[in-house]
């Protein structure tokens, strides 16, 4: 992998004080975090949530509580990295990256996080307090916006990395 200077004169600093090389790495860090989250969400969509949907109501409370505890440990770091790097790319767009891509990435992240907060978290809360057979099935259905958004973030991240000259 190589990082191109993106046509910036040596020593030029961007508004946040980042050099073009740092911004190139920031794009790659953002892409990596998006890839991690896309991988996790596809696993959740096709393996974990269907299994939760089959959890008997008498054991659903314990499973839901443990799911929330364990999942938080897995997604906390990549979500934080993704969030901060997305904000940084909005504030300080790298040269060579078309302006629409950081905003598209932020919009897709807002969809993923909004779906998490407004759809998934309430359903997990319901499963942990008052489980029924419909909650697991609804988790599978309402998880699709997150799955699509995080998958599309990977595409946006690859486009930004290519525009920065990180590949090729």
Predicted regions and their residues:
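Core segments of transmembrane alpha-helices
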Residues: 75-89, 146-156
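Transmembrane helix-loop-helix
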Residues: 88-110
């Amino acid at each position: 992998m190589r990082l191109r200077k993106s046509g910036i004169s040596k020593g030029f600093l961007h508004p946040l004080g980042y050099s073009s090389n740092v911004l190139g790495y920031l794009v790659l860090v953002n892409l990596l975090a998006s890839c991690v989250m896309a991988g996790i969400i596809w696993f959740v969509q096709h393996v974990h949530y269907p299994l939760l949907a089959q959890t008997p109501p008498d054991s659903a409370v314990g499973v839901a509580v443990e799911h929330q505890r364990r999942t938080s440990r897995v997604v906390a770091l990549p979500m934080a990295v993704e969030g901060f790097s997305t904000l940084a790319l909005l504030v300080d767009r790298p040269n060579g990256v078309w302006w629409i891509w950081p905003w598209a990435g932020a919009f897709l992240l807002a969809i993923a996080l909004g779906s998490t907060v407004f759809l998934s978290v309430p359903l997990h809360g319901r499963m942990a307090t008052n489980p029924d057979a419909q909650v697991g099935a609804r988790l599978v259905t309402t998880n699709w916006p997150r799955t699509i958004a995080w998958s599309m973030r990977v595409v946006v991240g690859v486009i930004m990395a290519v525009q920065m000259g990180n590949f090729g």
